[in-house]
């Protein structure tokens, strides 16, 4: 009833979402008047897989994962986190891995992306910024980026600068703040929303991780702010 239209899940495990089957989860969301949009989940590579560059076994996990997400009605699967790799070779292996995951998602009618935090603005081997390397070495046909604008700012960078440097790569945005959206004043939302066409944005996801009031009021305040700036 507040005005939110879709849900992004973050609890996929062994074929289920929050302990529910894909169909049960889909029905629960739709009963609330919303649709299932996306999900945060991932499967990391072992040291052995990184050393060999062979991630065949890891892809078997994704086959089940993709099937469950498709059954739940998801449009997008997003990897929410990757620690800073020790070497550029390891980072390249992850880029190759993500390209293959994205290819499998595409074959199933889904899209695959990566969500940043602040640590991706560190350099790997003191040579390459992690996020830039990933943007440059993943295939836009298979991998989009879900920019978390709060973490970009916390990483001392400008979301709009990244929109201009890598146009069309940011299919989704995580709109987030220190607490309720818009309260800290540290994120320049006006400039961000004026440049969404350049970024390639199709969906905006509101995320509130910390609350200064009861959760229902917190998410309402965040939506009220977004509505105020005409989102």
Spell out what each predicted region is.
Residues 1, 18-38, 61-73, 96-107, ...:
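Acidic (Asp/Glu)-rich catalytic clusters
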Residues 185-226:
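Long hydrophobic alpha-helical segments typical of transmembrane helices together
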Residues 7, 29, 69, 112, ...:
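Conserved, mostly hydrophobic/aromatic
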Residues 229-231:
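Conserved small/polar residues in nucleotide/adenosyl-binding loops
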Residues 9-22, 43-59, 83-92, 119-125, ...:
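Acidic-and-aromatic substrate-binding clefts and catalytic sites of carbohydrate-active enzymes
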Residues 47-144, 216:
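Active-site acidic/histidine proton-transfer and metal-coordination neighborhood
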Residues 6-7, 105-193:
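Acidic/histidine-rich catalytic cores of soluble enzymes
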Residues 8-10, 37-42, 78-80, 113-115, ...:
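A cross-family glycoside hydrolase active-site/sugar-binding cleft signature
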